[in-house]
Structures are given as structure tokens and as C-alpha cells.
Amino acid sequence: MRKTIHLFLFFLFLTSLVQASGVGSNDLPADVIRLTDSLKQVYAPDGRVALFQTHYTVSGRKMMLRGVTTAAAAKEALLQGLGKAGYEVMDCMKVLPDEAALEGKTYGVVNLSVCNLHVKPDFASEMTTQALLGMPVRVLQFDGWYRIQTPDNYIAWVHRAGVRLMDSAEVADWNRAEKIVVTTHYGFVYSAPNRRSQTVSDIVAGNRLKWLGSKRDFYKVAYPDGRTGYVEKADACPEKQWRKSLKKDPGSILKTAYTLIGVPYLWAGTSSKGMDCSGLVRTVLYMHDMIIPRDASQQAYVGEHIEIASDFSNLQPGDLVFFGSPATAERKARVVHVGIYIGQGRFIHSQGDVHVSSLDASDPLFDAFNRGRLLFATRVIPYINKMDELNTTDTNPYYRWGVEESD
């Protein structure tokens, strides 16, 4: 009976707002706009990695608040601010992850070789990034698709087929399990330890699968959803052995980058199947167990900032070089492109495809367009695991879920 009364009162409140007001976001009271904007700057200044999305229905001093946020403190501050301003608020705003709707399964592991993530929960929506098989993610919300957050904190929507949902115990089991890491740019998992057997799926560099054992020239593996198969030993390496063998010096990183020459440009791509400019940087470093921010405009503000000398003498191989529009008195530089510096004015980048260009006008590989929009560089390799945004899979919080308990 009490629940029925609450629902009836809720209906009356909603009806009065809808009938009394058709207020859109452009017609919100100025004090509400100021409060909302100020809190967004504090709690979610970059909407790619944090959410503070509000929707108001207003009638006089009454309002219904809807929307989502990843910061409980942001919602609390908003409600306090609206209350102090004299508004009577019906709170329908959700703090993510939405534990109740997801029934406790607020974790997940990517279940496809390359998983496409979108701005909206729709295949027709713009693709914004990708995630790789075996990657742990935070599951925030369900709306036909899942809204997830990847280990670099990027937030986007993924189709249900892309992620295996898990609770905290299940993701801990996954993180603690021994794994193999795919080291070939492209390969397959087979249903039997035989290349002539039925394929289970394709795989790409950086994929991780649970290691169940070995049979002849194959590793037996398991997917997040429990499927099993076999990966050729030539295409993968046990994770612990892989970590020990990794070299993280600029020469080794550039050697990896060169193996991607000719791979086509793909907007939002972050795999050896196809990549955009920042996706190339991210893919190359991930193949050396380094996790950095997703986009060029995020990568530009981690590590050591370098103002580039006219003869490029203060650049080192492995530095990231950035391109775009220079800063003005009104705004900071607008970064739209990135490459990895090779030396002697040359850099490798993804633009059309992965190739080498030069900033030196006397070089036959001179790229006049990008030379004209060169901004600055950053040095990130020495700062891995020394800045929150720069880490590895053995220190990143997503890959550590449940691991500390067993250490």
C-alpha cells in the first residue's frame, strides 16, 4: 500500500511538472546552469573519462533531476546546491555503476578479439575506441548495450556480444589466472591443436586468454565466456615470461612500430587490424605492456612537456610529437594528431596508413602539412608507473582487481 501511495505521489509530481513547464536546457534558471557547470568542471571536466550528465524538468521552484554521474560526490553537491537555492527536487539521477540494474555484475572482460566501442548504444553511432580480448573493464550501465570504462578510464558503449559480465569474485578469478599474451599481429584460436581444425575466433596482438595447458606446439586456452581452444605457441607467450622478456627502450618500441608499417588508418582503431594516430601510439606501447591515455589530446598532457628546438636537437627517439592549432590568449593548444619520433626529424604515424614522415624540408619524406602544424612533444617512457595516467598491466587497477587479496 505504501509503495502504491509513493508511486501515485510521484505521478502527481511528474504530471504537474510536465503540465506546468516545457523548460528546455536553454531555458534553465541561470543559477541552475551556473551550479551544474561549476560541478561538471570539478568532477567531470573530461567527459571521456568521467560522467556528469544532467537533465532537468522545471516548474517554478519544483524540478525533476535525471541523468547519470560517475561521482557520487557530484550528485550530493548538486542536490545540496539546489536545496540551498530553494528548489524542491525529485531525485531520479543515477550514480554509476548502476549496481541494482546490473544485479551486481559491474565488472566485465572483453570477449572479442577487437571490441568496437561507440559514443551511443547503437551500431550507427560514431565509434570512439576499441578494447582487446581479455581486457578487464568496469560495467557502468545497461541500456540495450553496456556502458563500460576501460583500463585507460575511457567511457563508451559496447554491444552485449563484446563483453562477458562478471561480479567481483569472477573478475578476481580472471585476473589471478595464468594467461597467454598474443604476440602476432593476427592469428586464430583453433578448436583442436591442429591448424586444419575449425577456428574458434581470430586474435590480434595484445589479446589475453586464460592458459589451461600445452599440447605439442599449441597452448590450450579459455575465453572469458568459457569457450576453449588452441593457440599456436609461435603466436603467443605465457604472460609472466612475456613480461620478463619485454624491452621498454625507445629502440625496441620503434622496432615494434615499424612492424605496423602499411596497416590502414581506422578512426577510433586501437589494434593491429587498423588504428588512428593515437591508436598507433597506444597499440605500440601496449605491446610493450605500457598503458597510456587513449586520445592524442590526452596523451599530450602526460609525461614531460618539450618545446621543440628548431633543429629538433632536443628530441629523443620514442618521444611523442603532437600537431594541431597553437594556443592563443583565449584557449590552450588544440591537439589533433600524434606520432612517435624516430630521430633526424623523422616520425612514424598513422594518417591514411602507418608510415614514416619527416619534419625536415630537405628530407625526401618531408611532410609539409604536418610540419606546418607541429606543436610540441612529450617524453612518456621514463614516466611509466610514475604518473597515475601512465602504468602497466601489473600496476593498473583494473588488472589488479582481486589480485592483491592473493598476493
Language-model region placement:
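Bacterial N-terminal signal peptides
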Residues: H6-S16
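Beta-loop motif signature
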Residues: V110-L133, V182-W211, Y265
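SH3/SH3-like beta-barrel superfamily modules
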Residues: K62-M64, K75, T128-H159, S201-K233
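Low-complexity, Gly/Ser/Thr/Pro-rich intrinsically disordered linker/tail segments
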Residues: D367-D407
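N-terminal targeting leaders
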Residues: H6, A20-M64, V68-Q130, M135, ...
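...with weaker cross-activation on analogous glycine-rich loops/strands in unrelated enzymes
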Residues: I292-V356, S362
